[in-house]
Amino acid sequence: MNECGGTDIRLFAKIENRRGMDALAELLPHADEIVIARGDLGNAVPLWELPAVQKRIAARCRENGTPFMVVTQMLASMEHSRVPTRAEMSDIFNAVLDGAASVMVTGETAAGEYPADVIRYLALAAHAAETFLKENGI
C-alpha cells in the first residue's frame, strides 16, 4: 500500500476457503491483518477440521509477524441469550492465547437482543486471556 501512497489505509485479507488457505504465504507480506473467517471456512472444510485450520493459519501469521483476527460465531448464542455458553468463552480465550490481535462479532451485535452484553463478555474473556498470558509469562 505504501507504494500506492495510501499509508493510512490498513489492508485485511480474509481467508474463507481452500484457495485462501493456499494463498496465505503470498498474502502475509502484503496484508496488515489476516481475517480467519470461520463461518466460510466451515463450509470449505469438514467442521471437525476447522479448529486445526484456524490453528495452522494463526501459527503462520505468528511466524510472519502478521496480526490476525478470528471471526464468526464468537458469541452466537447471545443473539437470543443474555449469557454466553462456556464453550464460547473458551473459544474467545483460546483465540487470544493463540495470538489473535482482534476478535470480531457480527450477528451478535447486528441483530442480537443483547449487543452491549455481547461486547462486555467479549472484553471479559479477552482480558482474562491476556491476564493469563502475563501471569504465566507466555
Identify the role of each PLM range.
Residues V35, M104-V105:
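Conserved beta-strand positions in the central sheet of alpha/beta enzyme cores
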Residues M1-T72, M78-D98, A110:
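Conserved alpha/beta-domain cores
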Residues V53, E108-K134:
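C-terminal helical cap(s) of enzyme catalytic domains, especially alpha/beta-barrels
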Residues G137-I138:
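Short coil/turn segments at secondary-structure boundaries
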